[in-house]
Amino acid sequence: MHSNRPKATSDTSTIVRLYGALLVIAITVGALVTAVALRDKEIQDWRHHLGSMSYMLTEHTAQTVFSAFLVLDAITEQVRQMDVQDEAAFRQRLSTVEMHQLLRDKIQGLSQLDVASIVAANGDNINFSRAHPVPRINLAERDYFKAHRDQPHLGDHISTAVRNKGNGKWTFYVSRRLDDAQGRFLGLVLVGLSVDAFTGVYGRLIETLGDGASISLYRGDLTMLARAPHQDDLIGRVNRSGTTHRVITEQGAQDAVVLTDTPRFSDGIGNLRLIAVRKAMRYPLVVSLVVPDTIFLASW
């Protein structure tokens, strides 16, 4: 009679090897699932962190712009109290050294404010905070001048960023139209905000985040006003293709934190990154904070 022991032993060995292989697979799958879960948690933690950071950053930006509007209010009220009713009187009374001193006093101690100006109906800068008498400067080609001249009921306006004609620095302006009693255009009051003031604050923040991070400030129509790191060729451009455009314009969201690898507005390159986008509550401004995966997945 033949013995079945060798076959039984062989079957047992096969089963042991099979169970061993299954155990290895189970451990590997478990490790992968755990790794994915931990990676997802890391991303979620960063989403929350960037959402909070974008809120604080947007509030700081709004407070900075608020200071410019306070100055705009004060200067406008001073001009209205003069009850100027024609262009000749406007030029005569608002071009004085006393008005120059008032403009200087209003922005003194506010380093984020670059200049305060009075502009006549033809675009001539008839007084400003930097010097008196004012050098010959005409601003008729600027977007804010055309907007107020052509739209009597525009209200307050935030301009695109331009090179200031007085000192050559990047500046954007809050402005208000001045009319006579009949509603005829007399001129403008301008308060200029230094782009450097924003890039300085933004730059210090991205230093704490790491290489590859960036912060952008846009006007409501997504015209770029400021960016850190600064790029001259991006200032004044309108974002019509990036994630910020999709969140704000296409989706109509107030804020969002998005994980994406679509091409960037800044250079067209697609890399994995988190983008925290937020609209300011009081002003037509949008802040966008970008962090690449080399930062938020640095431990992976």
Feature names for model-found ranges:
Residues 1-9, 47-49, 155-159:
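N-terminal sensory and localization modules of signal-transduction and trafficking proteins
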Residues 8-10, 199-205, 291-300:
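Membrane-interface helix-start motif
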Residues 8-19, 23-89, 108-112:
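Juxtamembrane extracytoplasmic/periplasmic/luminal helical "stalk" adjacent to the first N-terminal
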Residues 43, 47, 51, 69, ...:
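Short, structured helix-loop boundary elements
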Residues 58, 62, 142-146, 192, ...:
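Amphipathic alpha-helical bundle/coiled-coil segments
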Residues 74-79, 96-130, 142, 146, ...:
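Extracytoplasmic ligand-binding sensor domains of the Cache superfamily
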Residues 107-114, 121-200, 204-211, 256, ...:
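Extracytoplasmic/periplasmic ligand-binding sensor regions of membrane-associated signaling proteins
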Residues 239-300:
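Extracellular/periplasmic juxtamembrane segments that couple receptor/chemosensory ectodomains to their
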